[in-house]
């Protein structure tokens, strides 16, 4: 993160002519298990990762907000808080910030303007929640600058609202919640219905390895919407609000009444919720063989019942699995149809995993994987100014 801090503080001083008073960060995340359960009111188990979005900021006496995006060639934007905050079709990066600030105002928070320089190293388009990190870091920045009486959970909800209503992208609450509330060396078990969270300690000797398949993700939106509709149709058959409320026994008893594809989709969600709760327990106990079993079952369910994996992802999972055996776990993570694989491995195995992927993945798929070796880090907050 030190390079990011250097970038934002130097750029701030150069472009604004004075030093920033606050440095704030919010992390990206990876979901360890619990896929496509969020919109079914289920459980997820993400952790925050040590790839962050960082802001250098200072209060203003007036109501101007001046923005600089280091990662977009120091592109700038500015607006007045007393005027209507409008969507900018030509500056997508700025809309996440505008949306967060607009939603804070609508929630009744009062503050003046700010000078803000932002930069991040969360890989974009890899499904590691660079957008949620940006939304959360902006909410956190105004909290820190103006001592706003806002909880971390509300910062997360405010970010989700900005993405849904202002940016116009439908997302669950997981990404913002883990970015706002993550704890170092812990995963977070999140109940997507009650929004209750529980920090789950991770074994000390564990690396979180994220492997981007670099398979271009096609069909994501249309297939995602289809899966949501199928899950809603299944819930309707059972007369419940969401698949969270259906047991496997109930599904089996009514299977004949369901469309076979809908039944498969429902089976994934119901079993994935169970697996996520069991995985949290295995993590607490440091039971790697059990965690590995659950992650393998999760991947098989996404492949066979939810049908969201692709050949490249399955290949990547098989390569990693062959290296780690029962001493860790690996599965696809994220929406599907490409994207990333997450592996929980002993630090001593990281090099062997990297080597196996380098040797076999490109040969099998024609693609090179990008590998990020991470650890579970803390959620959004102030970075001490050195």
Swiss-Prot record:
Family classification: Belongs to the GHMP kinase family. GalK subfamily.
Biological pathway: Carbohydrate metabolism; galactose metabolism
Protein name: Galactokinase
Chain's role: Catalyzes the transfer of the gamma-phosphate of ATP to D-galactose to form alpha-D-galactose-1-phosphate (Gal-1-P).
Main location as per UniProt: cytoplasm
Record's keyword annotation contains ATP-binding: yes
Binding site for substrate: 35-38, 224
């Amino acid at each position: 993160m030190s390079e990011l801090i250097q970038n934002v503080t130097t750029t701030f001083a150069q472009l604004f002519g004075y030093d920033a008073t606050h440095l704030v960060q919010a992390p990206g995340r990876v979901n360890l298990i619990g896929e496509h359960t969020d919109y079914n009111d289920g459980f997820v188990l993400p952790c925050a990762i040590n790839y962050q979005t960082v802001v250098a900021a200072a209060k203003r006496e007036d109501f101007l907000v001046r923005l600089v995006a280091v990662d977009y060639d120091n592109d700038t934007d500015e607006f007045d808080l007393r005027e209507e905050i409008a969507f900018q079709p030509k500056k997508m990066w700025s809309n996440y910030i505008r949306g967060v600030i607009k939603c804070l105002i609508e929630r009744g928070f009062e503050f003046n303007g700010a000078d803000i320089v932002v930069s991040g190293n969360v890989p974009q388009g890899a499904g590691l929640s660079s957008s949620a990190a940006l939304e959360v870091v902006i909410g956190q920045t105004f909290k820190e600058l103006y001592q706003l009486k806002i909880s971390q959970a509300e910062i997360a909800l405010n970010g989700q609202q900005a993405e849904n209503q202002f940016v116009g992208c439908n997302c669950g609450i997981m990404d913002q919640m883990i970015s706002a509330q993550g704890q170092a060396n812990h995963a977070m078990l999140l109940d997507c219905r009650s929004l209750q969270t529980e920090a789950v300690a991770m074994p000390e000797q564990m690396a979180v390895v994220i492997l981007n398949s670099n398979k271009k993700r096609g069909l994501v939106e249309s297939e995602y919407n289809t899966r949501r509709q199928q899950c809603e149709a299944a819930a309707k058959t059972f007369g419940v609000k969401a698949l969270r409320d259906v047991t496997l026994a109930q599904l089996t008893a009514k299977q004949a009444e369901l469309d076979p594809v809908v039944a498969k989709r429902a089976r994934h969600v119901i079993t994935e919720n169970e697996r996520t709760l069991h995985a949290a327990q295995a993590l607490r106990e440091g039971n790697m063989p059990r965690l590995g079993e659950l992650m393998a079952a999760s991947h098989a369910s996404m492949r066979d019942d939810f049908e969201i994996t692709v050949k490249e992802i399955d290949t990547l999972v098989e390569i990693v699995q062959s290296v780690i055996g029962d001493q860790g776990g690996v599965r696809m993570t994220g929406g599907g149809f490409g994207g990333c694989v997450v592996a929980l491995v002993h630090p001593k195995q990281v090099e062997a995993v990297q080597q196996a992927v380098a040797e076999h993945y490109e040969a099998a798929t024609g693609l090179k994987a990008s590998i990020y070796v991470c650890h579970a880090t803390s959620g959004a907050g102030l970075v001490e100014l050195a």
